[in-house]
Amino acid sequence: MATGGGGGGGGMGGGGVGGGAGAAGVGVGGRMPTWRERENNKRRERRRRAIAAKIFAGLRAHGGYKLPKHCDNNEVLKALCNEAGWVVEPDGTTYRKGYKPPERMEVIGCSVSPSPCSSYQPSPRASYNASPTSSSFPSGASSPFLPHPNNMANGVDGNPILPWLKTLSNSPSSKKHPQLPPLLIHGGSISAPVTPPLSSPTARTPRMKTDWDESNVQPTWTGSNSPCVVNSTPPSPGRTMLPDPAWLAGIQISSTSPSSPTFSLVSSNPFSVFKDAILVGNNSSRMCTPGQSGTCSPAIPGMAPHPDIHMMDAVSDEFAFGSSTNGGHQAAGLVRAWEGERIHEDSGSDDLELTLGSSRTRAAA
């Protein structure tokens, strides 16, 4: 009787499992199984049911297990757990007898029911419920790493910094480099980017200084005594830069300066323009340009005149401009024209007149 009942129970249990397997077989791949596949499944299911019937019959006959007539594998597992000293509740909760766990262990929104003999202790997870004012600093009420009365009541350490981060700034590696600043770690999340506050110097874009008109703002090269600065840098129309009189003290200015534009390009005394500026007066606004005199030196008001001494006296006669190789001597300051050149003695650069039109119009004018 017991054996027959066991066989019937096994048949019922096997049928249930077999039906599930058949349904799963139909759903696999989204197609209907072929005839040969269905026959193989039936043969496999009949063999499984026969083995399950023998197992249930042996447990009822020799093990003394209280198995219902129509039982499944879960009932057999429950019976085996009861014999081994485990308790299986109707919802499936299993634990050793005498070590019933607490009702529920709430840990930051999740429930964990560890086994009594397990050494696994769930660690609290950090909360990332950010406050409205910042996207990286968690709120104090939801984060377990911030000091809060609720956190201390739940047994969670309210220390805002982890212990191993505390000793990071005091480690030997940081002592080797005393010039490095100490490590400052915020109590919240340190992985999210943080927008610097308005008081931070990095939050404001660097701005150029616009106080160019102030008298105390001077270039770095104005204090130098280099004579090349004055000649190579055109002065501003709004201000007059006076060169250092020290480097002009030893220069002797000549009174003779031909009016030919060609002479100024190869003039033996390019500083003759300074005397013209002195003779005009202190309030003169005459500025010399390379197109007019060949030099780019501003007028220097207030400079005392010097005796007229030719600078060409220190140069050899054979290298002087206008000298003759046949032994002839020419007067100083005269220029001899070469082939194809005309020297305009009677017209200066200021007397030139520009006319437009054809040759007839110019002839009539």
Swiss-Prot record:
Signal peptide: none annotated. Residues 215-233, 356-365 have a biased composition (Polar residues). Residues 31-113 are annotated as: Required for DNA-binding. Keywords: Brassinosteroid signaling pathway, DNA-binding, Growth regulation, Transcription, Transcription regulation. Residues 1-30 have a biased composition (Gly residues). Residues 113-144 have a biased composition (Low complexity). It holds the Pfam family BES1_N. Residues 1-45, 113-154, 191-236, 344-365 are annotated as: Disordered. It comes from the Eukaryota. One of its GO terms (biological process) is DNA-templated transcription. One of its GO terms (molecular function) is DNA binding. The keyword rRNA-binding does not apply. Belongs to the BZR/LAT61 family. May function in brassinosteroid signaling. Interacts with PUB24. This is Protein BZR1 homolog 2. It comes from Oryza sativa subsp. japonica (Rice).
